[in-house]
Swiss-Prot record:
This is Outer capsid glycoprotein VP7. One of its GO terms (cellular component) is host cell endoplasmic reticulum lumen. Keywords: Calcium, Capsid protein, Disulfide bond, Glycoprotein, Host endoplasmic reticulum, Host-virus interaction, Metal-binding, Outer capsid protein, Signal, T=13 icosahedral capsid protein, Virion. The keyword rRNA-binding does not apply. It holds the Pfam family VP7. InterPro entries: VP7, VP7_1, VP7_2.
Length: 326
């Protein structure tokens, strides 16, 4: 009798001990699984929230449409604005403190002191040779001149778009333009460009390849030339290389951190008819004021609206690198 009770008690005791062991094992296993899961979740959340600097994400969509001015000024606290103006503006204003005055006025629009830079250039022709657009946002003021309107249009086409350019060795090779986005861009103190189209036997069409005097002249003594010829046809070129550099360039798209403001003029500069301009709305505007103070006051008033039609996520333009996309 006592032996049976003792055996039963022993079985219960062993069962309890075994059950306790199993429960502890399950608890330890669950703790391990839970801790591991939490660790994975923590690491994953950190990776997901972090910015991936190893991938160059493409800029999608267009920033060329008009946007309603934002009420927030915070984005401008870390941005820089360059304002390019001709020498005649400073000469007319004739005030040594005029840039300081404008800086204080820009401050009222949310642009901190020191974030706006004033860049002076002599004239359109000189600026065409050495355009350097380094700021997050760049606004170029161009006084309209009927005798320079073609130069102004070419300059606007250059700085409002990104170009991928390669050197051209015109002494050794013939060149052809593959499509409408392919142009030859020349810069220098004096660029005279002549072309001779060739047939499939590399003989001149209406010209002699050995006589540059028979070539068609497409530019004469200009500082900036964007040359467009018939696509898919080889050409032999003659360029004043001593005073001019020419490159084979491809238009990649809009340079969205640049805007051009035409000052005055009965005609409005328009480069949107170029079939390679996509979208057809460019960051080009016109201000009709006779006095430069009025021009700058208007710029200050509408600077945020102008910037909202731009994007700081564009590459800088430096003619020292001959407007490569860098």
């Amino acid at each position: 009798m006592y032996g049976i009770e003792y055996t039963t008690f022993l079985i219960y005791l062993i069962s309890i001990i075994l059950l306790n062991y199993i429960l502890k094992s399950i608890t330890r296993m669950m703790d391990y699984i839970i801790y591991k899961f939490l660790l994975i979740v923590t690491i994953t959340s950190i990776v997901v929230n972090a910015q991936n600097y190893g991938i160059n994400l493409p800029i999608t969509g267009s920033m060329d449409t008009s946007y309603v001015n934002a009420t927030k000024d915070e984005p401008f606290l870390t941005s820089t604005l360059c304002l390019y103006y001709p020498t005649e503006a400073r000469t007319e204003i004739n005030d040594n403190e005029w840039t300081s005055t404008l800086s204080q006025l820009f401050l009222t629009k949310g642009w901190p002191t020191g974030s706006v830079y004033f860049k002076e250039y002599d004239d359109i022709a000189t600026f065409s040779v050495d355009p350097q657009l380094y700021c997050d946002y760049n606004i170029v003021l161009m006084r309209y001149n009927s005798s320079l309107k073609l130069d102004m249009s070419e300059l606007a086409n250059l700085i409002l778009n990104e170009w991928l350019s390669n050197p051209m060795d015109i002494t050794l090779y013939y060149y052809q333009q593959t499509d409408e986005a392919n142009k030859w861009i020349a810069m220098g103190q004096s660029c005279t460009i002549k072309v001779c189209p060739l047939n499939t036997q590399t003989l001149g069409i209406g010209c002699q390849t050995t006589n540059t005097g028979t070539f068609e002249e497409v530019a004469t003594a200009e500082k900036l030339v964007i040359t467009d010829v018939v696509d898919g046809v080889n050409h032999k070129l003659d360029v004043t290389t001593a005073t001019c550099t020419i490159r084979n360039c491809k238009k990649l798209g809009p340079r969205e951190n640049v805007a051009v403001i035409q000052v005055g003029g009965a005609d409005i500069l328009d480069i949107t008819s170029d079939p390679t301009t996509n979208p057809q709305t460019e960051r080009m505007m016109r201000i009709n004021w006779k006095k430069w103070w009025q021009v700058f006051y208007t710029i200050v008033d509408y600077v945020n609206q102008i910037v909202q039609a731009m994007s700081k996520r564009s590459r800088s333009l430096n003619s020292a690198a001959f407007y490569y996309r860098v």
